Regions:
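Alpha/beta-hydrolase active-site loop
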Residues: 318-341
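Substrate-access "cap/lid" subdomains that shape
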Residues: 231-234, 331, 338, 372, ...
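Non-catalytic accessory segments of hydrolases
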Residues: 113, 123-312, 316-323, 589-600, ...
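Mobile gating loops/cap/lid regions near enzyme active sites that modulate substrate access
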Residues: 534-664
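Canonical alpha-helical transmembrane segments
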Residues: 44-62
Length: 664
């Protein structure tokens, strides 16, 4: 954590105390009035503070201990010289004013810190009142009361009359007029492909024609048709098959220098979620660093985005339905690559950032020939390419189930079904744990992503991979207890059945480990703990294999305790911390740790810019030097701060689980 005071702060306080004390006493001794002396006092103190801060906290001084203490010595000598000069000239002693002013200067930060702690305590109390012990999962009722749903669900319209040209951006597909708020401009609901409706349902996204038409970009586009769980935040937001839109946020100040671009991939098990999730609001990140451009977007989900019709009569006309969600993502990245320069972004410095299913998507796109060159850096948290299905069996079963539920027999009949009917069926099928997601089909996605990495698919892509200690409770809080328990049991059973065919000894060792854990906790939680450890290990192995194939890889381990144990601490907390999203964290039952968030935002900005991943001492005031070394070291983030160290032994208590994940 940041220190309230460092030796540098105390030295600056020392200099300011002299400035304030003599700044008031000298004019007063010269016969000036109190207000004139007070004005001089403030000016002298402020100037000395700024000068001392710029000198002491400069990279040159803070990067070298000898320089720091040389500057300290110089400041002391300056004080002695000032003492001698003022004593000789006016008979005043700087020492007479030092203690009183020094206590005042040091006391102000203490009072501010106490105020911040009081505010934090108040927020924690409100969250605990709302969530209790967290056993009911995420609850958004209070947050939704503050939202004007009619306003949120409005749609952008064409503009035929006058518009604010300062807020207008011309792209290849149209002119979009955004909204300015303080030092930020938003462009929301911009289409990046033709609407996948009518005859384009279950077809690959088609590029938009070139246009000079003018459109509003004030309102978020519709979310994809999706499953609504107990802890879904987007129940209030309109949903539509016409969902292929993106949002752009950038600083309002014009500059000729092209900015790095951050593209956010939302989470949601490929079945729910979207860019309207307040958690993914990157405004605070852009506000704190306006020289980057933020982008978020929607893509098709569930049976609209990941379904195999190859065994349905007429299904051969829909060969891309298996991985439509990924094709949408590629289409979005292509639009961004072609148009982001108009918004001040650098098309050659695009970083993609994803959580959970968003992270899985990025790992798959890194292995995909169609996505090659569309991004240069990748931040993935709780995701790996092996999470995609090896065969289309699951997606074929989804199509079979769809036919059963709708009594349809052909693609022609499926195409005639209304959106509402398909949503109703989707809710039933997928809510009953009928899984959905991408498939390593050999067409779009290679069967072995790691082999593709070794063969150069992700050359020139730099990776930042994150894993969490307590992610399982986050998932439970979203989908509910029953779905969570069914998922844990099914995932583990399938994995163990596979391991039986590969290494029966390790499979039995895993079962023994579960029984051992079940002696001190419910069996389902023992299984969940194993699944959670396997998830973290899969991220670790992804980092290892990328590093072995010559990629630059940074690893991160989130080990922060949850505010409410039953809500966990993982994806939602990491997203809020890196984006500086205090309100998003509160909605999901936590209070943003501003110290951790400030440090992680700084690291993220360094990653986007291509700067060295290290802090020199006091680069962030109160934070010592941190050097985030590449894999196999990892940046461990805990309540006690950040440190870089190996983490393999932290991810599991049983080495058989590592072999288990290597086999899978």
């Amino acid at each position: 954590m940041k220190k309230l005071f460092t030796i540098d702060d105390l030295m600056i306080g020392f200099i300011m105390a002299i400035g304030y004390g003599l700044g008031f006493a000298v004019p007063k001794a010269m016969g000036w009035s109190d207000w004139e002396s007070g004005l001089v006092c403030w000016v002298v103190g402020y100037v000395l503070q700024e000068a001392a801060t710029r000198i002491l906290f400069s990279k040159t001084v803070q990067s070298n201990t000898a320089y720091r203490y040389t500057v300290f010595g110089a400041f002391v000598l300056l004080f002695l010289a000032a003492e001698y000069a003022v004593m000789s000239w006016m008979g005043l002693s700087a020492s007479d004013y030092l203690l009183e002013q020094y206590l005042y200067i040091i006391g102000l930060p203490v009072l501010m810190f106490a105020f911040q702690m009081a505010v934090r305590w108040y927020r924690i109390r409100k969250i605990r009142e709302q969530y209790g012990d967290g056993s009911h999962g995420f609850v958004f009722d209070d947050a939704l009361k503050k939202i004007d749903l009619d306003e949120v669900n409005r749609q952008n319209q064409p503009i035929t009359g006058a518009y604010d040209t300062d807020l207008a951006v011309k792209t290849k597909t149209g002119i979009y007029v955004g909204v300015k708020e303080k030092n930020i401009i938003y462009y929301s609901g911009i289409p990046y492909a033709k609407p996948p409706v009518g005859e384009r349902r279950w077809k690959a996204p088609e590029p938009l024609p070139e246009s000079e038409a003018v459109f509003e970009a004030k309102y978020l586009g519709a979310s994809a048709i999706q499953v609504e769980h107990e802890g879904s935040i987007l129940k209030h937001h309109r949903q539509s098959e016409d969902c292929l839109t993106l949002n752009i946020c950038t600083g309002a100040k014009k500059t000729d220098q092209k900015k790095p671009v951050l593209v956010l991939f939302h989470h949601g098990d490929f079945a729910y979620g979207g860019s309207a999730d307040p958690l993914l609001d990157g405004v605070e990140l852009i506000r704190s660093c306006p020289d980057i451009v933020g982008v978020s977007f929607n893509y098709r989900l569930g049976l609209f985005g990941f379904i195999d019709f190859s065994q349905v009569p007429g299904g051969d006309a829909y060969p891309d339905a298996l991985n439509l969600g990924l094709l949408d993502q590629i289409a979005a990245l292509k639009w961004i690559k072609e148009n982001i320069a108009a918004f001040g972004g650098d098309p050659d410095r695009i970083t993609v950032m994803g959580f959970a299913s968003g992270a899985i998507s990025i790992c798959l796109l890194a292995a995909c020939e169609q996505a090659k060159g569309l991004f240069r850096k990748a931040f993935v948290f709780q995701g790996n390419p092996q999470a995609a299905y090896e065969t289309p069996d699951v997606s074929r079963n989804l199509a079979k189930k769809l036919l059963q539920e709708t009594s349809a027999t052909t693609m022609e009949e499926l195409m005639q079904l209304s959106t509402d009917r398909l949503k109703e069926v989707s809710q039933k099928i997928l809510h009953d744990l009928y899984p959905t997601g991408p498939t390593r089909d050999g067409r779009l996605i290679p069967p072995d992503a790691f082999e593709a990495y070794r063969n150069g698919s992700a050359d020139h892509v730099e990776f930042l991979i994150g894993v969490a200690r307590n992610e399982r409770q986050v998932y439970k809080s979203v989908v509910g207890k029953q779905t969570y328990e069914d998922f844990i049991t099914n995932e583990l059973d399938i994995a163990l059945q596979f391991l039986d065919t590969v290494n029966a000894t390790d499979a039995q060792a895993v079962r023994d480990y579960i029984r051992e854990l079940a002696e001190t906790m419910p069996e389902i939680e023992a299984k969940a703990k194993v699944v959670e450890q396997c998830s973290a290990l899969s991220g670790y192995l992804t980092a290892r294999k990328l590093a072995e194939s010559g990629k630059k890889v940074y690893l991160m381990y989130w080990n922060v305790k949850p505010l409410i144990e039953n809500l966990g601490s993982g994806t939602v907390d990491v997203a809020a911390a890196f984006l500086g999203n205090r309100e998003g964290a509160q909605m999901y039952g936590n209070v943003l740790n501003s110290d951790i968030s400030e440090m992680l935002r700084k690291f993220l900005i360094k990653f986007l810019r291509g700067d060295a991943m290290r802090f020199y001492n006091n680069e962030i005031k109160g934070v010592g030097a941190i050097d985030w070394k590449r894999f196999p070291k990892a940046l461990v983030i805990s309540d006690n701060g950040l440190q870089c160290e190996p983490i393999e032994d932290k991810l599991t208590e049983e080495t058989c689980l590592l072999r288990f994940m290597e086999a899978i």
